[in-house]
Amino acid sequence: MTFRGTFEHALDAKHRLTVPSKFRAALAGGVVLAASPETSPGSPRSIAIWTPEAYDGYADATLANLSPISPQYRELQRFLFNSSHDTELDSAHRVMVPPFLMDYAELSKDVVVTGSGECLEVFDRSKYAGYSDDVLIRVPDIAARFGHTP
């Protein structure tokens, strides 16, 4: 499944996020919550929501061209697996965000869930608002660098 769209949600007092209804079937077999490595200037940190199969594929592809004995491989491997958490949707279609991921992404109660192709991303709503406005301004320049027009 390709994850698309933007949805505003609120975490409950136990840091549970209700998954948007259109994605529940795709995530029914399990969920990996993971810290998203941010590489874009000004991008707020986020949590990614993956299917286990998609996350394993992402991790494998990320590590594929590195020597398993290199320091870079070990650092990436640690990040990918130490900053992720296996879980399942509960009966109310929620996932509990563990404290270490809440802290990593600096999430408050109000969040934005965005489709990012292979996964969903969860951002703090106030931090995401300024970032999304900035990205909209930069899209034409980014696309032009690759010979495309938006």
Predicted regions and their residues:
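Flexible "stalk/tail and boundary" regions
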Residues: M1-H9, A13, F23-T87, S91-A92, ...
